[in-house]
């Protein structure tokens, strides 16, 4: 049986820490930035760690060998 492919969308959007947590970039930066304060824009920079349930769902449903 051939190897399963990883979903390309997940490969591009998420990274994983050594302990298995899922890292994603902050959402809400594409448009409507004029109505946000400078502090809100500043806080949206960088990445965030997803909550455990979201990370579990990413690994279980979108990665072929994510959850053993």
Curated annotation (Swiss-Prot):
Gene3D superfamilies: 4.10.410.60. GO terms for cellular component: cytosolic large ribosomal subunit. Keywords: Ribonucleoprotein, Ribosomal protein. The keyword Ribonucleoprotein applies. One of its GO terms (biological process) is translation. One of its GO terms (molecular function) is structural constituent of ribosome. Belongs to the bacterial ribosomal protein bL35 family. This is Large ribosomal subunit protein bL35. The gene is rpmI.
């Amino acid at each position: 049986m051939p190897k399963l492919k990883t979903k390309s969308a997940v490969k591009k959007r998420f990274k994983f820490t050594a302990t298995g947590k899922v890292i994603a970039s902050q959402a809400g930066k594409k448009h409507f930035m004029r109505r946000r304060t400078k502090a809100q824009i500043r806080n949206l920079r960088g990445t965030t760690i997803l909550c455990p349930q979201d990370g579990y769902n990413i690994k279980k449903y979108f990665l072929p060998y994510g959850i053993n």
